[in-house]
Structures are given as structure tokens and as C-alpha cells.
Amino acid sequence: MKQGIHPDYREVVFQDMSNGFKFITRSTIQTRETIELDGKTYPLAKIEVSSESHSFYTGQQKIMDTAGRVEKFKNKFGARASGKAAK
């Protein structure tokens, strides 16, 4: 294998921001934050949803705080977006 062309494959902590669940896995993700877990320092990757919080795996319906994005887009670009689609 050529040296210096492969990404750094290492242990990384992923933290589910919706419930605080953390798990360690191997990844090439680049992060700026670190966390100490079990006496060892790991890079920290923050994620919005994991198997611990996703409704498919938990069996519970959960409302995400994403409502209103379409309305904001329509308010901001509604006239221009609908005008181009009509042509």
C-alpha cells in the first residue's frame, strides 16, 4: 500500500445529541472535539439520531424539531420558486 494516501482509521466516540447515548466504533471521520471515556481520549462525533433514539428501533413515535422548514423556504423563495416552475 502507498504511504500517506489512506485516511486515518481509528476509534471514535459517536454521541447521540437527542438522548446523550455514546458508543465507540472505528471510523475515518475528522473531528475537532475530543472526549475522555473509560480513561482514554477519543475523537468525538456528534450525531442527531442513532439506533438508541430512532423511532424504527425504539418503537416510539418521536417528533423532531424540524417543522417549519418548508414554510420558511416558501416564505423566502415562494414567489420566485413558483414562478420558475410555472414556465
UniProtKB/Swiss-Prot annotation:
Q: Which UniProt keywords apply?
A: Ribonucleoprotein, Ribosomal protein
Recorded superkingdom: Bacteria
GO terms of molecular function: structural constituent of ribosome
Q: Name one GO cellular component term.
A: ribonucleoprotein complex
Matching entries from InterPro entries are given as:
Ribosomal_bL28/bL31-like_sf, Ribosomal_bL31, Ribosomal_bL31_B, Ribosomal_bL31_sf
Q: Which Pfam families match?
A: Ribosomal_L31
* One biological process term in Gene Ontology: translation
Q: Which Gene3D superfamilies match?
A: Ribosomal protein L31
So what family is this one in? Belongs to the bacterial ribosomal protein bL31 family. Type B subfamily.
Subunit structure, briefly? Part of the 50S ribosomal subunit.
Q: What is this protein called?
A: Large ribosomal subunit protein bL31B
The species is Burkholderia thailandensis (strain ATCC 700388 / DSM 13276 / CCUG 48851 / CIP 106301 / E264)
